[in-house]
Amino acid sequence: IEDNGLFRLYYRGSANNPLGNDRHTQDNPMTVCYAESRDGVNWTRPNLGLVEFRGSKDNNILWMGQEALAFAPFLDTNPAAPASERFKATAATVIPGRKQYALVGFVSPDGKRWTKIGDHSIIPDDTTNVFDSQNVSFWDPTRNKYVTFYRAQKSGTRWTKFAESADFAHWPKESIQWFDYLGAPLEQLYTCAARPYPRAPHIYVGFPNRYQPHRTSPQQPGPDMNKGINDAVFMSSRDGVHWDRRFLESFLRPGRDPLNWTDRNNYVAAGLLQTGPDEISVYFNQNYRSPTAHLRRGVLRLDGMVSVSAGYRGGEFVTKPFTFTGDTLSLNFETSAAGSIRLELQDQHGNPISGYELETFPPLWGDHIDHVVTWTANPRWGTSLKKLEGTPIRLRVVLRDADLYSLQFRQAEPAKP
């Protein structure tokens, strides 16, 4: 979680579990632990002094007990949220008299001292609810509501449900919908790690874990361990229900470490952090159930989850008609030394707009995160596209040995005096 220049990390802790699995004892309870960082790279574990563990409060534990199983916090950006509830969280727990897990809510003024908001499930009961892994929630300013993605089971397959609510403590049953993967192959996907992408918050990006239950690695440590191996994939959505999985390949592979080829590894943490002007950090677990269990940081270029890519022989695409707000167009791209990107603006019927034809656009080459483009036929307009603002257009993009990661129409920054 990014909070005014401070990065906060929450993780489930365990201490020298002799069983080597998820069985917790009185001497080895489930805990929620806390770390923080100013750069997302170097992390400290502050002494919180909140929870007694083995006779001492000198630790970074902020919660102990069943709720630590799937404790998932977020910074509440709802402008109406009181200061005492600046942070919120969900967690799976067992409520007396219930056979299945319930999803309960928590609030906190500082992200460290947490209060449970009752022993009721904030999600209506349903026999398909599971909740036993990370359930992601957040305030969505584009909807003006809270959104949650939580684990469920559909015909024996791990699945995820969507719900939305104006009240974090109560989620209406009529808002609940199953994820729709739009015809993608049926796979065991859960812990979706999905949140709005910070640079385009109207788009959700997710990194669900993909579980292969019938594959067992030789490194699988003992008969008490769960079978299966895991990796992570990428998906995106504009409404939180319909998810685009056109990229079916693994986003995060287990790699060469044999201890990453056991179950419950390669889970991506919810929340991408921008840790530099041109990079995003993504965090994931490795060596689960092993004494060397740890979190690892991976780095992507800004907007670098996927790209439109063309080889040396080249390729092109044309968008659907759209309108834009702003007066400049910026590209995030890279090419080879021999590669290039060229653009053309067309009217909604596919006809080139005078002055914005492909032949008037100088080929772009290089590696840029934020490159404002111009057409040579329009020197008097410079980079301005103001005359086309609000008009339906198409964008034609021609690539050769190049990758286009993102494009953005925006208002040009005022000239410095």
What positions do the PLM features span?
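Carbohydrate-active catalytic/glycan-binding domains of CAZyme proteins
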Residues: 1-417
